[in-house]
Amino acid sequence: MSIPLILASASPARKKLLQMVGIDPIVRVSNFDESTINADDTLHLVQTLAQCKAQTIAPKFDTGLILGCDSVLEVAGEVYGKPKDKSEAIERWQKMRGQVGTLYTGHALIDRVNNQTLTRCGITKVHFANISDETIIAYVDTEEPLKCAGCFALEGKGGLFVERLEGCHSNVIGLSLPLFRQMLTDFGYQITDFW
């Protein structure tokens, strides 16, 4: 019998990543108000948000592991979560094009049996293509960038505008699989315990 993994996220990309490696998570959306958190640096911000999301869901479960994640993109000192609307997405892309950004994904894992919590952060450098205003507008019109931290989906059309990555590919999608596996190991589990 596998150990239940509860994903405290509405992200279809995170769920799909877990399913690709043989884990079928129970999905519970935390609805945590992210605007209540202020942090001194991006790394601390994403780890705190991930932990708050997981902690919001944890009391609903007596067993299993709760996984919370949060991603933001930092470009030239500006931190980008999901854009509010199309005009903000266009403005961000005009600043991002031709630049190198840093994608931070905070991971929080709560073991309900042992009442322990781990937080970690995956960091990946993203090199963006220098695309035209027309391409930016066409991409934003697909509405894909409105659903993603950093205004792009690597696993979607946005992948066309990324020239290269330095670091973990799955981290950019929203969940670093190698980091998640290591967190399980740190708790004394194996990834196969969740198949």
From Swiss-Prot:
Enzyme class: hydrolase
GO molecular function: nucleoside triphosphate diphosphatase activity
UniProt xrefs under InterPro entries: ITPase-like_fam (IPR029001), Maf-like (IPR003697)
Residues at the active site: D70 (proton acceptor)
Signal peptide start and end residues: none
Catalysis performed (reactions): a ribonucleoside 5'-triphosphate + H2O = a ribonucleoside 5'-phosphate + diphosphate + H(+); a 2'-deoxyribonucleoside 5'-triphosphate + H2O = a 2'-deoxyribonucleoside 5'-phosphate + diphosphate + H(+)
This protein's UniProt keywords: Cytoplasm, Hydrolase, Nucleotide metabolism
Enzyme nomenclature, EC number: 3.6.1.9
Compartments where found: Cytoplasm
Keyword Cytoplasm: yes
Coiled coil segments of this chain: none
GO cellular component terms, semicolon-separated: cytoplasm
Organism: Microcystis aeruginosa (strain NIES-843 / IAM M-2473)
Annotated family: Belongs to the Maf family.
Protein name according to UniProt: Nucleoside triphosphate pyrophosphatase
